[in-house]
Amino acid sequence: MTLTLDDSQRLAVQLMLTARLAIITGPPGSGKTTTLRATLDALGPDVVVRLAAPTGKAARRMAQVTGREASTIHRLLGWTPNGWTYTANDPLDADVVFVDESSMLCYELGAALLAGTGRSRLVLIGDADQLPPVGVGRLFGDLVESGNAPVARLATNHRAAEGSWVIRNAPRVLTGGPIEVDNCAGFTRVEVGDDARDVVAAVHGAAVAAADDPSLVVLAPSYSGLCGVDALNVTLEPVLNGESGAGCATLARGPERLAIGVGCRVIQTRNDYRLDVMNGEIGTVVALDASNGSAAVEYAELGRTVDYPSRESTNALQPAYALTVHKTQGSEFRHVIVVCHSTHSFMLSRSLLYTAITRAKQHVTLVGDAKGLARALRNDAARRNTALVEHLNGTLPEAKVEL
């Protein structure tokens, strides 16, 4: 099948086919996946290609959309407790390495990737406007800004014809607003007062109204607090799990007395290569034995049920009705309820709100107070003071040393 490309996509393909290091950035709907597929189609059969992503879930999605094998960066570079298998002294044997969701790259993982692919052409694909990684630095964003690596920016919105208010509001968030709300067109706002308990009540109401949507998820900035992820999961589990109730076997989780039981939606929180289930995969508990901590989880996207044989393995499972924004990078959901309240004021930023709303494919419900939204739209916190751009551009001031 011949893929139709716009001008920016054609330039990106040319860059990926020729540059030693290529950076491809664009928002949701700009055609990054189509551009990658077109590039892979253009490569000859003798070209050794490797695909990778920072997380297991992102790697699985990359494999699904390309029809090729993809792995985590840790697997690609052969990470062991003793270090990396592929390094600058013994790099990976590949002609081209493509890395998706590159905005998740911290400096440590990015440095390992650059060293371990020293023989290969490297293509980094992502969205420079998303949240910076949990780890130190914002490698992808700094490379985009530095001008020291060739960058292709995909600007055409290929989802605009769908009339998506998510796509319409995303660039508004990045420039500080204002955002548009249309309760009939997929972008709803529920304004509450300063009290965090009002947030919980509003989220509860929105979740009840959309309880028949299995793709519904609530996103909050942090785990802690009255309207954090842990507290919201305690509130939402009885609403969204029709099988919960008195007498049901459960496994306790964490200081907030979270529990998982049959019917509970859960998320895998670390890669388990033995069970072949990756960090970020979301499933439903279909069986549980509280006496030994074993469980069975059905993963619809994987098309299989995974048996967790012991409490040690099920310790990686957490309730997934509410998740942090960071935890959902690289994922999409039909309906997203976003908590944007001044209770989390120190964490609110444009990049966090942008990343949160762009997890939604169809509908966003924004819950919070006016102060919280104003704080998020005002705070351009993604611009971390990393100094990497200045280092790459050679503009760091010389240190003054007094003798």
Model-derived features with residue positions:
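Conserved helicase motor core of P-loop NTPases
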Residues: 1, 11-15, 19-20, 129-275, ...
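Conserved SAM-binding loop
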Residues: 5, 51, 98, 218, ...
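Helical mechanochemical/support elements of P-loop NTPase systems and associated helical scaffolds
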Residues: 8, 12, 35, 39, ...
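Conserved helicase motor core of SF1/SF2 NTP-dependent helicases
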Residues: 18-23, 38, 42, 46, ...
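Walker A (P-loop) phosphate-binding loop of P-loop NTPases
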Residues: 29
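Conserved lysine of the Walker
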Residues: 32
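Conserved RecA-like helicase motor-core motifs
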Residues: 47-52, 68-76, 151-153, 239-252, ...
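C-terminal accessory regions
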Residues: 175, 267-271, 275, 279-403
